[in-house]
Design a protein with these regions (language model features):
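Conserved aromatic anchor
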Residues: 362-375
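Beta-strand-rich modules
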Residues: 403-430
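Short carbohydrate-recognition loop motifs
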Residues: 215-242, 489
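Substrate-binding cleft of secreted/luminal carbohydrate-active enzymes
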Residues: 74, 78-215
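Extracellular fibronectin type III
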Residues: 426-442
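Extra-cytoplasmic beta-strand recognition segments
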Residues: 230, 242-271, 301-305, 336, ...
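Extracellular beta-strand ligand-recognition surfaces/modules
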Residues: 261, 299-336, 505
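Disordered, acidic Ser/Thr/Pro-rich linker "stalks" and the adjacent N-terminal cap
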Residues: 441-504
Length: 505
């Protein structure tokens, strides 16, 4: 009805005439789902079932050509859930041509299986890097000889959302242990707000070095805005340098374009932010190199990029130059902004508490609503407790559920102030919209209930089972919902029934 460009994919499970059947590719009994009818096609993409091989892939390529369709409209399915993400056995020889190029597209079934391979957020990102970049941690390098997994970035060219004339990122992964605002802690507890995730580095991590490479990772203990920064650390030798390629971009530079960089640490070296103004990712334009003024505390620097007006920034990197050796070297990158829009977004309007539910005189749930604006990337909601503002949540929505509004035992009166700030697509914050939360009572009017014990059995273990062990990440131990075995509480088995022995604590 709104003419949204929806893409339709056909899963290789049905034939055109004879019912259910997996051909494991585009074949003689299912090609009709991809056959053109004038200028239209029944399906935009074809997802081949997982049991393909070289012969079946050859036939898929030939069938696509016969149908005058691209062979890359056919996706070779990878069963990542049962296989265990990057532990999945893949018949790469059946997928790659003599030049190492994919012959079909990749269809990733359940790539979120990564979550089952670790116990912490840091574990997740390490496994995510292996899945997408490979064990070698470099999309330009071949996989190690003793490993089977290539890494998706080794096979598929990079694409980027960093286009136009404005790009900003705080490298926010959408979760954290604290929330920082301009380098200061505003929420001192764990959170998970996926809608405020930032654009993460395109290449994690594409590095070259004349010495040992720096260790690159997300730092959840210190950030400039949001929950994490990028940390580069290690022992460095003198007379060495490091190239860390961060982003593929396509950013237009005007006379008003400026660079803002928030960073911390790095003393004992020279650190540059550099841009490639050619599509080949070469950094040969001297005007596109900006040396940072290093500081032990968070520093937000601004650079004029008008000398690059009329050019396009195709890539962004960090360059470290070490004259002398430094032990325990560390540099944190907290925020990166390239924009010619230096106007803060308009403040939200019409902020109100549309629903609330009191648990006691100090804790409540609520829903706030307001009118936002198109210049906002997301919104931060705060509560005032005494003289301090404390972050409640971050969200890209304009109707926001607040699971825990709270005030301290020494709060006075029956109302509490809330505020909402818009964070712009250029990284700037708006003025605040405020509203009053009416408790209808003072903190002395109720007592706090005794906290309920958590409904988990952290020491429970699976000690035996008639289900077979799985090579994937979703083994039988994952059936213990609520136990701390991984980031996933799913398990998978092809066996229809069986028994499990569990030891409780």
């Amino acid at each position: 009805k709104v003419n949204h460009p929806i893409k339709y994919a056909w899963y290789d499970a049905m034939t055109y005439k004879y019912g259910r059947y997996h051909e494991d590719g585009l074949g003689d009994y299912n090609y009709q789902f991809m056959q053109k009818e004038g200028d239209k096609v029944p399906a935009d993409q074809f997802f081949a079932n997982f049991n393909w091989n070289k012969e079946k892939n050859d036939h898929s390529v030939e069938m696509a050509k016969w149908l005058e369709r691209s062979q890359y409209d056919v996706f070779a399915g990878l069963e990542l859930q049962q296989g265990g993400s990057y532990k999945t056995k893949v018949k790469w020889d059946a997928l790659l041509d003599e030049k190492g190029k994919l012959r079909l597209s990749l269809g990733l079934f359940a790539p979120d299986t990564i979550t089952s391979l670790g116990k912490t957020g840091e574990d997740y990102h390490k496994n995510e890097d292996i899945f997408f970049t490979g064990y070698q941690g470099d999309p330009t390098a071949q996989k190690p000889a003793d490993k089977e997994w290539y890494g998706i970035a080794n096979l598929v060219a990079d694409r980027t959302p960093a286009v136009g004339r404005t790009f900003t990122t705080s490298f926010n992964t959408g979760h954290g242990r604290k929330w920082f605002v301009d380098g200061k802690v505003s929420k001192d507890s764990e959170w998970n707000y996926r809608s405020v995730s930032g654009v993460l580095p395109t290449w994690r991590w594409w590095q070259t070095s004349t010495g040992e490479k720096l260790r690159a990772e997300y730092d959840f203990t210190d950030a400039y805005n949001g929950g994490n920064s990028l940390k580069f650390s290690g022992d460095v030798a003198g007379k060495t340098d490091q190239d860390v390629n961060l982003y593929s971009t396509k950013l237009e530079v005007t006379e008003k374009t400026k660079l803002r960089v928030a960073h911390k640490g790095g003393k004992g070296s020279k650190v540059y932010m550099a841009f490639s103004t050619t599509p080949d990712y070469k950094f040969e334009d001297a005007a596109a190199w900006k040396e940072l003024t290093l500081s032990d505390d968070w520093k937000n620097e601004e650079f004029d990029l008008s000398s690059l007006a009329g050019k396009t920034i195709y890539a962004v990197k960090l360059f470290f130059e070490h004259e002398g050796a430094v032990k325990d070297y560390q540099f944190n990158l907290g925020q990166l902004t390239i924009t010619d829009n230096h106007q803060a977004p308009q403040a939200p309007t019409g902020l109100s508490v549309v629903k609330q539910s009191l648990k006691n005189a100090q804790e409540a749930e609520a829903v706030v609503q307001f009118s936002g604006n198109q210049d906002a990337d997301f919104y931060e909601v705060y509560e005032k407790d005494g003289d301090n503002w404390r972050l409640l949540t971050g969200s890209s929505a304009s109707t926001i559920y607040l699971p825990k509004v709270s005030r301290s035992a020494n709060a006075t009166g029956t109302t509490q102030e809330l505020k909402v700030v818009a964070v712009g697509k250029n990284g700037l914050r708006s003025e605040a919209a405020t509203a009053s939360f009416n408790w209808g009572m003072t903190v002395q009017d109720t007592t706090l209930p005794r906290p309920l014990a958590e409904n988990i059995v952290p020491g429970a273990t699976v000690i035996g089972s008639t289900f077979p062990n799985t090579e994937g990440g979703e083994g039988i131990e994952g059936m213990l919902n609520g136990t701390i075995t991984s980031l996933s509480d799913k398990w998978s088995s092809g066996q229809l029934s069986g028994s499990v022995d569990i030891r409780l604590t």
